[in-house]
Amino acid sequence: MVKGPGLYTEIGKKARDLLYRDYQGDQKFSVTTYSSTGVAITTTGTNKGSLFLGDVATQVKNNNFTADVKVSTDSSLLTTLTFDEPAPGLKVIVQAKLPDHKSGKAEVQYFHDYAGISTSVGFTATPIVNFSGVVGTNGLSLGTDVAYNTESGNFKHFNAGFNFTKDDLTASLILNDKGEKLNASYYQIVSPSTVVGAEISHNFTTKENAITVGTQHALDPLTTVKARVNNAGVANALIQHEWRPKSFFTVSGEVDSKAIDKSAKVGIALALKP
């Protein structure tokens, strides 16, 4: 259903996915099965040092309605109900997490050829109200993201962003934390098998800068390698292989050049789907 400029979260997303997606510092395993009625059940386990986290997620789809229920080892139950296009261009999402009775919220998204709007409100007496809006086209868009705390009467956050796409190049500029932090990102397809990207952030309060550059290259249609490095001297690399349709095996590593005497961090992820 997504059309036009999309939602505010799309601003800078290509660069973020290139630089941060799929990098893993832990051991993660997930397997998805489907019942004869089409119900999808995904079991996930993550080993974080001496801590093991797990969850079981169930998804049921019926026409434009989707129900997701996830039970985690922290004794929480997350339920998400999605109604896709109850009216043209509209999506409604209702979510609640137990036992946290303050976590419930409803979100409405609207997609137009020249705009994308999302607004959400929590199910509490004094909720936090979120609003984000983007206007423009697939090539040029401008948006804002605002959260207002009705209890304190203050803005929780106020962000603004700009996105530009032309042919194989995408660039974005985002002002975060009520104007305290500026992020600029760049993403470019340099060949059918290779992309490069970078992200630069500046904090106006602390005067600190952060730079991350990365690349991705497809060795073959089923195998991809990625690498990134930042100005703190931390380098990451991964290799991901799709050994069967929708099933991925990923190995990633991290080395800190300023603490070379310490062992490198290695992460492994295995996702199985029928």
Curated annotation (Swiss-Prot):
It comes from the Eukaryota. Disulfide bonds: none annotated. Disruption phenotype: No visible phenotype under normal growth conditions. Induction: Induced during the hypersensitive response to X.campestris pv campestris and by the bacterial pathogen P.syringae pv. tomato. CDD domains: Porin3_VDAC. Expressed in leaf tips, anthers and stigma. Gene3D superfamilies: Porin. The modification Phosphoserine is found at residue 76. InterPro entries: Porin_dom_sf, Porin_Euk, Porin_Euk/Tom40. Keywords: Cell membrane, Hypersensitive response, Ion transport, Membrane, Mitochondrion, Mitochondrion outer membrane, Phosphoprotein, Plant defense, Porin, Transmembrane, Transmembrane beta strand, Transport. It holds the Pfam family Porin_3. It is found in: Cell membrane; Mitochondrion outer membrane. GO terms for cellular component: chloroplast; chloroplast envelope; mitochondrial outer membrane; mitochondrion; nucleolus; plant-type cell wall; plant-type vacuole; plasma membrane. Forms a channel through the mitochondrial outer membrane that allows diffusion of small hydrophilic molecules. The channel adopts an open conformation at low or zero membrane potential and a closed conformation at potentials above 30-40 mV. The open state has a weak anion selectivity whereas the closed state is cation-selective. Belongs to the eukaryotic mitochondrial porin (TC 1.B.8.1) family. This is Mitochondrial outer membrane protein porin 3. It comes from Arabidopsis thaliana (Mouse-ear cress). The lineage of its organism: Eukaryota, Viridiplantae, Streptophyta, Embryophyta, Tracheophyta. The gene is VDAC3.
